[in-house]
C-alpha cells in the first residue's frame, strides 16, 4: 500500500513491468487503495517488495483519502492535501507514527474516503470562525472496519483544517 494511496509512478511501472514477465501473476486493486500481486513465488514476492520499497511502513502511513476537491466536482475540501499536510507535519515534528491509527478522510459527507469506518475519520465541511467561513473537517471518532466489531464512528466536532495536524500531534 503506497503511503497515503499515492503510488510512485516509476516504482509502480517497474513492478508492473516485472509482473507481466511472470507466469500466472495478477495485480489486484483493493477498495482501500492497496495493490496486491497474487500467485507469486517467495523470490518473486521479494523482488516486487524491493521494487515498491516506498510502500507504507505502518498502519498510519496506510491512511486513505479520496481525491478531494482538487479533482472531484462535488468535494467540499482537499482531503488528499490534508492527509499530505498531516504526514509532513508529523514527520517534521519527529512524531513516531507507528502507534497512530489509520486515518480515513473524505472531502465531503459522501464516503469515498470511508471516514465513517476509521478509528479517526474526517469529512470536509466549513466552520464559521469570527463570522467568516473557514476550511474545516468534521471529526468522526470510533469507527471500525474490523470483522466482529464493525461500526460507524460518531461525529465528534468540527475542526479548522489548518489545526488538524497539530490536533493529531497531541
What are these regions, as identified by a protein language model?
Residues 121-170:
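Mobile "lid/hinge" segments at catalytic clefts and subdomain interfaces of large enzymes
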Residues 1-5, 38, 138, 154-157:
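Accessory RNA-recognition modules of RNA-modification enzymes
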Residues 2-132:
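Small-residue-enriched alpha-helical segments and adjacent helix-cap loops
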